[in-house]
Design a protein with these regions (language model features):
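Hydrophobic single-pass membrane-insertion segments
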Residues: 2-13
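Short extracytoplasmic/periplasmic juxtamembrane "stem" segments immediately C-terminal to an N-terminal membrane anchor
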Residues: 16-27
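Terminal, contiguous helix-loop blocks that mediate binding/assembly
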Residues: 23, 30-60, 175-176, 180-215, ...
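Loop/turn elements at helix/coil->beta-strand transitions in domains of secreted/extracellular proteins
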Residues: 63-66, 97-102, 160-166, 206-212, ...
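Residues in well-ordered beta-strands of folded domains
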Residues: 68, 168, 391-393
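Residue-level signal for short, function-critical loop segments
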Residues: 73-74, 108, 171-173, 396-398
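Catalytic-core segments of thiol-dependent peptidases
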Residues: 106-205, 217-218, 223, 240-241
């Protein structure tokens, strides 16, 4: 049994095995706890209920509950001890055990960081007298199989009946296309179809719905995921964005006595989640990251799907008339999720923000969808601009996946007209001749006007280029001295990427480069790095002075970590000073579909490498500018306690160049010619 109170700490790398006194007392001698139950009446069906489904009236008093957690340990447990931390939170939650059964199914990890759970078996744990106790165990099964989940649900319903049931999925999440729950022992996960199959074979359905179903996992707050559970649950709680490694705050269990229905439970979960992270970010500013969590009413999902279908059926009808250009621009501008914690693009955007952007072209249909979403989203909170509580898959970065996505969504009977639309939209994006308007882009002449440190950059687009323009950014490169390079060609380091580019009605691109870059400084001798760091401004539907830069973390003596860990380190510029935030461990090749929800704690590493990738500049077969990565990275090593970052002016005489980078409405990228700064 895990004993003792556990309070979450800011450090993501805490050694859980050393943080608590853990004992194994064996199986429970208690019989299954059966709280008193009460009958619940149903409301009469309405015309909106196409399946003649009835909705239960709200409870007038607090019901008895059985809360079920399906905890797939994965590397989150074997590497970080994250499941153990949450089990300890459950023990310390103070939940009223007389009214609430809490049962946990564990497995799917190669190693567990406590003595209660063993990797060779799967366990069902029951919370008794503030301790988790084994009530059932068997030889380890694959938690990525639907049957394993179904068996757990059957066991709980049969042995721990209650007025209401809540089900929480704990582990990795990767959105509707990839699914949930990586069992690292079997290399398997649960797809949306498998989750649907598991619930279909379980005791929970139209006659006995779960009061609430939630995902303590990344990226599962999509309309497609919610659709899977519409027949099996009343309310749904999940995050649109990547969840931090600490996940939910299970102290919310103590508040269940004050909740009569699932919407109230969902609100408590969201509030505890945000209270915890607000406190964490105050104590540890470097831990700050984007967080979202929402509770939605699955009963209102049918109206959302209907409005979604009407909007995108009309858009689909217009794609052949050139509407693809404007729709593509709206898609690009939509708030996106899961952009920086994995090399995978999930193509998930905020549905409310997307609908808002489409209002100019389709005012009636977009407004109807927004109205439906208002009824659907019961409660949501975030520290993210344009996050409205529900995301949707919309192809853009990876249009080739749309065909497979369509098969998945069609099998789930989700929004067939929308599925037809995303197929047609993707086909338009992949048209082979779509980038022809920019074949002469490298001949466009860039202009520079320097005032002090600042450089005003501009470039005129042709009428044809303007027609298919979607977005623009600019890069700043530094030419390497010949004696510094590894090749015979000129090499350039990418030191800055800016997203704040404007386009006039006449087709003129303009941007202002402040003429400053971030340099690393050695604290012990005051020496600055020879080159600036590579800074990439973040754009995910919002534009702030927030950047990331690639780095490597070295652990010189800890065998539990790789010798070399690649990461993206986030940074904010405030009052002219760089402020380091969190760093994301870039997902490994074997688990690349799943974002790594655990942030890198830089304090765990003794040596940092800040590198700049080197490129050569040439032309492609059409005469357009082409950048080629040389395979080399130039940079500098700094000890953990012997560096700082400073924003400093660059010397234009050292050979700095600008280039505009255009993305057209079909997803093609085009580079302008290089033009020298300071001349």
């Amino acid at each position: 049994v895990l004993v003792g109170v556990f309070d979450k700490e800011p450090s993501d790398s805490e050694d859980v095995s050393a943080s608590a006194d853990k004992k194994l007392t064996g199986e429970s001698n208690k019989k299954p706890q059966v709280p008193d139950t009460e009958d619940k009446k149903t409301a009469p069906a309405t015309e909106a209920d196409e399946d003649n489904e009835t909705r239960e009236k709200p409870n007038t008093k607090v019901p008895s509950r059985t809360v079920m957690l399906y905890v797939v340990g994965s590397d989150l447990e074997s590497r970080y001890g994250a499941a153990t931390m949450d089990l300890m939170e459950i023990e310390a939650s103070g939940v009223n055990e007389k009214k609430t059964n809490v049962l946990v199914y564990t497995g799917g990890a190669k190693e567990w960081q406590n003595t209660l759970v063993d990797e060779d078996e799967n366990y069902i744990l029951l919370l008794e007298d503030e301790e988790l106790t084994v009530v059932e165990s068997h030889k380890a099964k694959n938690m990525g199989k639907a049957a394993t989940l179904t068996e757990f649900l059957e066991y709980c319903e049969e042995n721990y009946p209650a007025d209401e049931y809540e089900l929480i999925f704990w582990n990795h999440g990767a959105g509707p296309l990839y699914g949930y729950g990586l069992d690292e022992k079997n290399g398997d996960l649960l797809s949306l179809q498998e989750l649907s199959d598991a619930l279909e074979d379980s005791p929970f359905g139209k006659s006995k719905k779960l009061e609430l179903l939630g995902f303590d996992a990344c990226l599962m707050g999509s309309i497609e995921t919610a659709w899977v559970f519409r027949d099996y649950a009343e309310y749904f709680v999940a995050s649109q964005e990547i969840e931090p490694g600490q996940g939910w705050d299970y102290a919310f269990l103590s508040e269940l006595d004050g909740c009569k229905n699932g919407d109230e439970v969902g609100k408590v979960i969201v509030e505890y989640y945000f209270d915890f992270y607000e406190d964490l970010f105050k104590k540890s500013p470097r831990a700050e990251t984007e967080i979202t969590l929402s509770c939605v009413d699955l009963y209102a999902l049918g109206d959302v799907e209907k409005a979604l279908e009407e909007l995108f059926e009309n858009i689909d009808d217009d794609l052949g008339d050139g509407t693809i250009k404007e729709i593509s621009r709206c898609r690009y501008k939509s708030k996106a999720f899961g952009k920086f914690a994995s090399s995978t693009s999930y193509d998930l955007v905020d549905l409310k923000h997307l609908a808002t952007l489409l209002e100019d072209e389709y005012p009636d249909e977009a407004e109807a969808l927004l109205d439906a979403l208002e009824e659907y989203v019961v409660y949501e909170d975030s520290n993210v601009k344009n996050a409205g509580g529900v995301s949707i898959y919309h192809p853009y970065d990876t249009p080739t996946l749309a065909k497979d996505a369509s098969k998945l969504l069609n099998a789930l009977s989700f929004a067939p007209k929308y599925v037809t639309y995303i197929n047609n939209f993707s086909k338009e994006l992949r048209k082979s001749g779509s980038g022809s308007n920019y074949r002469s882009f490298s001949k466009n002449t860039g202009e520079v006007s320097v005032s002090g440190d600042k450089s005003d950059l501009s470039m005129q687009l042709t009428k044809e280029q303007l027609e298919t323009f979607s977005s623009a950014k600019y890069y700043i490169f530094k030419e390497l001295p010949a004696e510094e390079t590894f090749s015979k060609q000129k090499e350039y380091l990418n030191i800055f990427s800016g997203q704040d580019v404007t386009l006039s009605a006449s087709g003129e691109l303009s941007a202002t480069y402040q003429g400053k870059a971030v340099f690393a400084k050695k604290t012990s001798d005051g020496e600055y790095s020879e080159f600036p760091l590579s800074m990439y401004q973040i754009y995910d539907g919002t534009l702030e002075e927030k950047y990331y830069f690639p780095c490597m973390f070295y652990d010189l003596d800890n065998g539990d970590f790789p010798d070399l860990l690649p990461a993206n380190w986030l940074m904010r510029i405030r009052d002219g000073k760089p402020q380091l935030l969190n760093a994301y461990d870039m997902a490994s090749d074997e688990n690349k579909e799943f974002p790594n929800k655990y942030l890198v704690n830089a304090e765990d590493y003794e040596l940092y490498f800040f590198g700049n990738n080197s490129y050569t500049v040439g032309t492609d077969d059409n005469g357009n500018t082409q950048l080629t990565f040389t395979g080399s990275s130039y940079g500098f090593e700094y000890e953990r306690d012997d560096f700082s970052l400073e924003l400093r002016p660059i010397d234009y005489d050292d050979g700095y160049y600008a280039v505009f980078v255009i993305e057209d409405v079909y997803g093609n990228t085009h580079f302008s010619s290089f033009f020298r700064l300071g001349e």
